């Protein structure tokens, strides 16, 4: 472990001293630490501190048309280290719990005006403050010189490099489509040139120079020194490679994925991403698989495993299971333990311990996969993960939020309250206000900071550590919950038009509606309004007690959040392929499995007011098509955007989000839902594109009888 840390530190310093990047062969030549080729490539691939990208090079002396293009493998230094924006802003500024550098931005640019006057800069020029030293140590870069640190920040912190004008890069004329022209506060330079991808070369009509009068004047206004200007091109290119090529090329020599012989995938060969506060759904363990009822099977985007947790380590670009993960989980659930000692390990390696804070297994990365947090699912969902939140008292003991401790007043928030606030903070698009949670304990007021995992007394300034650990579930507990009766106590609340004799404990039943029934006619009329020339062959009601209960629970939650007001609920269409019908009936709509119906208004499940729109997505090799008429809790909606992965926050309300997105606020016809609990697949319509019903033997018999009776 010590040798790996030394190697990471040396590689980082070599790269930053060389302008943030080095060709792989040159890095090997300069490296003093004794590392073999395989060991170095594993280090670069697995530690999360570097990116290996391919960058085109052109042979010297070759013309643009006949240039002998080759490619070099470049290693770039990566870091999550950032400057604190609140510290740069107006007073009172940052409270000091940000885990980011308190440093002047213009010092990084090498051109702070206070350097020339000898006056003290309010934003700080001292890297050696207790706060900054702690931040540097946390990121493992406290050994870098000032110049090396500046290079690392410039190519990783997106707030530092000047913005490129995208309008300048579009349209004709000397300023492209930029209406501000010379008054534009962004740089007028070819964005493809900065990315190393401009195919026009010297004949490009966009500027390729930072030193022309317009660009230089702009850069001087922004405070960049002449030395930094001379390095800008390589820095922009480094930043582009880190942002856009790292995930695809960081694997130096990936191992081929082995065959998946069972539903429990022992090796996960997907791309490795650095840990983030929020758990991606693709790294969640499938709750339906644990209940042995996942209809998506191999197409399921969640992990299939027999436990609600899974401990793995990174080996050769693939995640592999750790041995004795029940013992690891039991230790991890204890907040007083920050590691577990290993005397033996999987795959023939020997490591000393598994560190829960750094998530390192010896020299390599480790991770814990788990089921969804219990606060995101209805109470009757089994084997969700109960996360417990603790704070450390003055005696070094961990106290659970909302529980009575010895000599401590009870907090006004529970673990569930903290968990909900934490997930809101982790959600995409959450603003800065979501990073803190205010509460009381006795007569004292506190603030919990999710970024730093600390709580602060707002009067005395006392700071305490905070910890989040799961409630332990043994394999025996899992078996017991799987086998026990998971039905809710009391009578089931079902629609009065459902068939009570067709309610399976798990799964669903399709009930074919009589064409003469009022229920059939209602569905037919909605469908027929925009598809009058198509023939409805069959309409079935979907009876899935599990999905219905979840839908009703979601409706109650939305109603509470809406101050008790009724939630906007609509009947909307969704066209699909026959291949996905049973999976949708079993587990609801999931665009990651069933496919996208567009991304214009966000990445979610699309529903339409008109059957004619959904028909375009009702794919079939025959004349027979499938379409759902679903109940959808659209709630409060907003116009969508292609970049949305969830609805945005409401204006002025950091923890309140819209419920869905639409194509038009004045006349919405398309709705995008990101949370599947807001949908219930109520009816399945099977229809034909033929305007006449297909002839069947029964029709011929009836016609024959009619003809005979007339003789």
Swiss-Prot record:
Residues modified to ADP-ribosylcysteine: 484
Q: What class of enzyme is it?
A: transferase
EC number(s): the record gives 2.4.2.-
List modified residues, type Phosphoserine. 268
Which keywords does this chain's UniProt record carry? ADP-ribosylation, Cytoplasm, Glycosyltransferase, Golgi apparatus, Metal-binding, NAD, Nucleotidyltransferase, Nucleus, Phosphoprotein, Repeat, Transferase, Zinc, Zinc-finger
Give an example GO molecular function: NAD+-protein-cysteine ADP-ribosyltransferase activity
Keyword check for Repeat: yes
Cellular compartments annotated = Nucleus; Golgi apparatus, trans-Golgi network; Cytoplasm, Stress granule
Task: Relate the protein's function as given in its record.
Answer: Mono-ADP-ribosyltransferase that mediates mono-ADP-ribosylation of target proteins. Displays anti-alphavirus activity during IFN-gamma immune activation by directly ADP-ribosylating the alphaviral non-structural proteins nsP3 and nsP4. Acts as a component of the PRKD1-driven regulatory cascade that selectively controls a major branch of the basolateral transport pathway by catalyzing the MARylation of GOLGA1. Acts also as a key regulator of mitochondrial function, protein translation, and inflammation.
Q: What is this protein called?
A: Protein mono-ADP-ribosyltransferase PARP12
